[in-house]
């Protein structure tokens, strides 16, 4: 991804008035000369072209491409990676100038690539709190094969009509040279949109250079090679580009070189450039206008107050629409001069004279340090990140610069609403006006507590929202302050304390609302058997795209606390499971079994915690429904409302759920039930019952393929009760609950197709005689990779252990180690002995987090979608802003080797990765899902992205044991837990909604 700030099509801009671009020297000389083009003087186009070539040859040696990542969301910047440009402004000390939105407000990791393709690490030493510039530093001694040259900053040379070149990493193409002419030097700054970085209180320079992403931070040079401006942004649908003047960057550079503080002053007011005609409408006195025009003959505008921030130094003094006339008794119409005065007046009084309508108003404001209201630290806790509200964001929404901003709403604080833009008001009914108060409040909250949080959206201060969150200090253990260190360029971590232990759950009793028997008939009492389920997953595994899932579960055994839900709600066993009874009581639960082929997840809760709540166990009927059977449908729609209808079974078929591009669990080899009622498409969970209230089928949500927009397609289907009963009986009896399974996936085919493929007529007659209703057989569509291929794709199953197979339930092998099968292969009937396989290790039981990527063994959905496994190290996800993101290690890839050493499994991978030093490159051999080999180089970053090894362990807290590897050979228990990966988490909650 290449980053370049872009203005919206409707961004504010001021007309330049009557100014027109001056003719360039070439045109002027050609006009004056009476000679032919061949006889041009050396000062003509030929000399100009030569001069440009010489200047550009020198400039390109100072320009670098920057490849960087912001590893954490902070202020206006999301976490992510990008490419941009920079240029050397001090070769001796190693300073580079680029944009603030490149240097990033938050943690930055990056390197620069010079013209000769030498690479050097860079780190930020300064990012301006307001303007779009910052400085990176590098070690000049690390550049061995070229002389590093610096460019001179000449803000005085930026004039209308100046021919310029933009030299940089345009479109991430390493080096591009774009030509243009400066057309304006007094335009207002572009507006890049909400909740993103926007410059203010300066003028911008405009030219039509048609730059694109990646050119941010490029030098804008004139023909002698002097830098006259800094490329900052551009229009999305035009060739227009916007440049930052260099007056303030030049001052900051001098301060860095002299090792003096870069003071920045503010009165917390935004000014805009307004033309004289606009100022006249606001009340500008004609005598004052004449005075200004006389002093500044080329002036076309003055400064007008646009925004005054509440509780700031100028609050209740300046007002919107005030025209600035004097500052400290000096007429001032230039934003750069205003900034210069404020920067030199931090802590001092500044006297302003403004025209307000027909009145002249003189007022005094004390200039405040802008650095004091630009956050340089954040707190990470419960998987989310918090910092004091910044001047940048407060200015955009005219808010006082106070409050706690949630820069990364994740983990426990993944709140309902938009993805970003939350201001936290209170926790546990205690106000949190600033970050220090927030820390003290969080210290007193035990792990797993459910606490009230008050918050509002930054764009809507009138609507205060109260919600309840569950504090997670067991998966996401980190509670630390992260502070910017401009000496090292890193952000330093400081532990803020261990979590208080969770308080034990206490029994509670509630009543269950009764349904009207007249309206709901035989299903009225089934409401007593349902509980709601909330599953929170701190890591994305097995191709899952969500952090939270909501659904319902049917209680099967109230004495043992056993219930069943779908694997669309509980896809894997790493997370926190909570059930809600009668919308009143919430208690913890745990996953006890995930069925390897059916869409069933069995969960367990402590019945004692429900006290005398009249929860009931559903009665399941050991009966397979048939087409045409009358049933009662009882379900929960997308709003969790109960609906019911009397209907009938329309079909019972062997369903094949389409697979998604990123493999994830899907039910295979099962018979699905559909019903006539339209309610079935609106409900993601429920049951089908007979007229006696016995459950004959569960109603479940299945995830299938994805649409072209990337949204999940959901299928709502019924599953017969006998399938559930077989697992329930195992759980109740205490025997091994994991069934044996076949290593293949089937699909149903008609006998006519089998006949065409060579099945003898006598066998078809026998099948028709035995099957009765179903004239079908089953064809192998996938064989699980990594298992013996006794059966192959395209085989047709004729019989198993002497019985014709026309229904999928005839192939149940729960307790069978081997099956004698008669198959049709390549037109010939054959007999084979097919082994079954235990499903004990079907689920993910080890996870390695490295480079910000989540690695695991290929889960069963992967093995059923691929022919052969390149390795047993599978990338299931990656975090934004991580080394994996920056160096293009993508999801659904396999890691086959590390530094040339084959890594067949996670054990091999961890062994090799522990040998590698921090900040060094590692050569990673990978294979795509389609077996295309790719070799990557990834830089280790153990400061922000340590390697963490998670192994399922029943004796450990949460059922998982975690080990963190920092230095080579060093092993310790992780104090930070791990960071939730939100890259593909495209919704706060995933509910069992309408079928798509």
Curated annotation (Swiss-Prot):
<dbReference type="InterPro" id="IPR001478">
    <property type="entry name" value="PDZ"/>
</dbReference>
<dbReference type="Pfam" id="PF12812">
    <property type="entry name" value="PDZ_1"/>
</dbReference>
<dbReference type="InterPro" id="IPR036034">
    <property type="entry name" value="PDZ_sf"/>
</dbReference>
<feature type="region of interest" description="Disordered">
    <location>
        <begin position="1"/>
        <end position="35"/>
    </location>
</feature>
<protein>
    <recommendedName>
        <fullName>PDZ domain-containing protein C23G3.12c</fullName>
    </recommendedName>
</protein>
<keyword id="KW-0677">Repeat</keyword>
<comment type="similarity">
    <text>Belongs to the peptidase S1C family.</text>
</comment>
<dbReference type="InterPro" id="IPR001940">
    <property type="entry name" value="Peptidase_S1C"/>
</dbReference>
<dbReference type="GO" id="GO:0006629">
    <property type="term" value="P:lipid metabolic process"/>
</dbReference>
<dbReference type="InterPro" id="IPR025926">
    <property type="entry name" value="PDZ-like_dom"/>
</dbReference>
<dbReference type="Pfam" id="PF13365">
    <property type="entry name" value="Trypsin_2"/>
</dbReference>
<feature type="domain" description="PDZ 2">
    <location>
        <begin position="745"/>
        <end position="827"/>
    </location>
</feature>
<feature type="region of interest" description="Disordered">
    <location>
        <begin position="972"/>
        <end position="996"/>
    </location>
</feature>
<feature type="domain" description="PDZ 3">
    <location>
        <begin position="860"/>
        <end position="930"/>
    </location>
</feature>
<feature type="compositionally biased region" description="Acidic residues">
    <location>
        <begin position="980"/>
        <end position="996"/>
    </location>
</feature>
<dbReference type="GO" id="GO:0004252">
    <property type="term" value="F:serine-type endopeptidase activity"/>
</dbReference>
<dbReference type="InterPro" id="IPR009003">
    <property type="entry name" value="Peptidase_S1_PA"/>
</dbReference>
<feature type="domain" description="PDZ 1">
    <location>
        <begin position="280"/>
        <end position="358"/>
    </location>
</feature>
<dbReference type="GO" id="GO:0005634">
    <property type="term" value="C:nucleus"/>
</dbReference>
<dbReference type="GO" id="GO:0006508">
    <property type="term" value="P:proteolysis"/>
</dbReference>
